[in-house]
């Protein structure tokens, strides 16, 4: 159903399996999952248009980027497959947290790793769980491709966001990457 599709887009694989697989088939689903070769799936996954250029713009401006996802053990492999892993640190997935999104634990972990206050960070996400996680952490939320979310900014695509951010001045000499200027 559309509701199940929306649910599995946002939640961890463990939560999704528990919701959509009948209880009497959970062991079978776990066995399939344990034996799945994700490398076979990667050719069917694609990057959003403009993503790499956007990441390069941010990196060139000294703006830090992280991943906060409800994926579990495939995130790093997926980032490496697309050769974009160099842009993100830390990478926080549901398997590394006590409480996945929408709990703010992952956002707090990123802020602590960077040593940054909430007011210097924007969280770009596409789901209600992203919106809730950012809100619970006190971080500005920008909605990607989802105008139904309550966000400080709606981003229809990465090219549009790149154009918006292109006007931000290059890093000021003496300013570190830990002090991005998003104002």
What function would you assign to each model-found segment?
Residues 1-61:
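N-terminal helical cap/lid subdomain that shapes the substrate entry/recognition surface
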Residues 52, 56-63, 72, 76-183:
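Asp-based, Mg2+/Mn2+-dependent phosphohydrolase catalytic module
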Residues 68-69:
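Conserved phosphate-coupling serine/threonine residues in phosphotransfer and NTP-handling enzymes
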